[in-house]
Amino acid sequence: MSALIDFYAKHSRLVDQIGINAILALSLSVSLQAGQLALAQAAFMGIAAYVSTILALNAHWPLLATIVVAVLVSTVVAAILAYPVRRLRGVFLAIATIGFGEIVRVIANNLKITGGAEGISGIPNDATTPVIYGALALVALVLFLLSKTKFALAVALVREDEYAARGVGIDVGAIRTLSLALGGAIAGLGGALYAHASFFITPTDFGFARMEQILVWCVVGGVTSPVGAVLGAALLSVLPEAIRFLADYREISNGVILLAVILFAPGGLSSLWRARRRTAARRVTRAAT
C-alpha cells in the first residue's frame, strides 16, 4: 500500500491524465463503432472546457454544475453538426469535421472571453483523481448498458451495411446523429475535467494535434473496441513518461507503436486478446472431443 501511495505522490498528474485520456478515447470510439470517421472530438472537448472554465471563474459555479452544462452544450453542438455532415462518409466526413474543429480553434483564438491565444489561467483545480475516475466509471457503465440494447445492434448494422440497415427499418440518420451526439457528450465530459485538472487552457490544447492523438489511441487499441480505446489511451499516456530518458527521441514513441500495430495487428491490441481467446476456446473444444 505504501508503494502505491508513493507512486501516486510522484505520478498523480499522469494518473489523472490517463483517466481523462481514456474518456476522450471512448468518445471517439462511440463514433467509430457507428462507422463514422468523425474527427471533431477535440473541438467538443474544447467547447466544454471553455464553457466549464468560464462558468467556474465568472459565475463561480461549483464543479458539478459547470460539468453538466458543459456536457449539455457539447452534446447539442455535436447533434447540430451531425445534420450538415449526415451525407458524408469516410475521408470526406473526416475532412469536414476536422474543418469544424479548426473553426472552433480559430474562434477561441480570437474571442476575449476565451482569453484569445493566451488562454485562461487560474482555473480551480477541482477535478481530483476520484472525480476523474468516477466519471470514467460512469461513462464505462453507460456504454456497457447501451451495448446490451437494440441501439447497439442498430449501430453495428449501420457500420457494416447501411443499405441492409435501411432495409430492416433502421433510421440510419438518427443512429448516426445519436452516435455523434453521444461521442460529443463524452468528449465534453473529458474536456471539462481536463480544464479543471489543469491550471490553464489555450486554443492549441484543442487543435488538430489533440484530435490526431485521440485517433491514434483508438487505432492502437482497436477502432471498434471501447476496452481497446482505453487500453490504447493508457499505453500511449504512460509510454512517453516511461522512456523519458530518451529525451527528444521519446516523442516518436507513439508513431513507432502505431506503425507496429498497423503492420502486425491491424485490428488493434484488443484484436490480439480476442484472437487469443478464440484459440483457447478451440483448444478446449478439441480436448472435449
Identify the residue ranges that each predicted region occupies.
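Cytosolic-side transmembrane-helix boundaries in multi-pass membrane proteins
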Residues: F7, A154, E160, R166-I175, ...
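Single transmembrane alpha-helix segments in multi-pass membrane proteins
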Residues: Y8-N58, I80, P84-L93, G222-P226
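Loop-to-helix entry region at the N-terminal start of transmembrane alpha-helices
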Residues: A9-Q17, G122-V142, F200-I201, R250-N254
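Residue-level recognition of pore/gate-forming positions within transmembrane alpha-helices
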Residues: Q17, N21, M45-Y50, A70-T75, ...
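Alpha-helical transmembrane segments within multi-pass membrane transporters and channels
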Residues: A59-E102, L231-G232
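Transmembrane helix-bundle core of multi-pass membrane transporters
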Residues: L88-A152, A156, I175, R286-A288
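Helix-loop-helix "hairpin" substructures at the membrane interface of multi-pass membrane proteins
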Residues: T128-T202
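Transmembrane alpha-helical segments in multi-pass inner-membrane proteins
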Residues: L180-F264
